[in-house]
Amino acid sequence: SHGKVETDEEFDARWVTYFS
């Protein structure tokens, strides 16, 4: 994502990738 504000989907997708 670009910029400070992200959607919940972007946030979740990033963490899902980290912890998978």
Curated annotation (Swiss-Prot):
One of its GO terms (cellular component) is mitochondrial inner membrane. Pathway: Energy metabolism; oxidative phosphorylation. GO terms for biological process: oxidative phosphorylation. It comes from the Eukaryota. It is found in: Mitochondrion inner membrane. Coiled coil: none annotated. GO terms for molecular function: metal ion binding. Keywords: Heme, Iron, Membrane, Metal-binding, Mitochondrion, Mitochondrion inner membrane. Signal peptide: none annotated. It is a peripheral membrane protein. Component of the cytochrome c oxidase (complex IV, CIV), a multisubunit enzyme composed of 14 subunits. The complex is composed of a catalytic core of 3 subunits MT-CO1, MT-CO2 and MT-CO3, encoded in the mitochondrial DNA, and 11 supernumerary subunits COX4I, COX5A, COX5B, COX6A, COX6B, COX6C, COX7A, COX7B, COX7C, COX8 and NDUFA4, which are encoded in the nuclear genome. Component of the cytochrome c oxidase, the last enzyme in the mitochondrial electron transport chain which drives oxidative phosphorylation. The respiratory chain contains 3 multisubunit complexes succinate dehydrogenase (complex II, CII), ubiquinol-cytochrome c oxidoreductase (cytochrome b-c1 complex, complex III, CIII) and cytochrome c oxidase (complex IV, CIV), that cooperate to transfer electrons derived from NADH and succinate to molecular oxygen, creating an electrochemical gradient over the inner membrane that drives transmembrane transport and the ATP synthase. Belongs to the cytochrome c oxidase subunit 5A family. This is Cytochrome c oxidase subunit 5A-1, mitochondrial. It comes from Thunnus obesus.
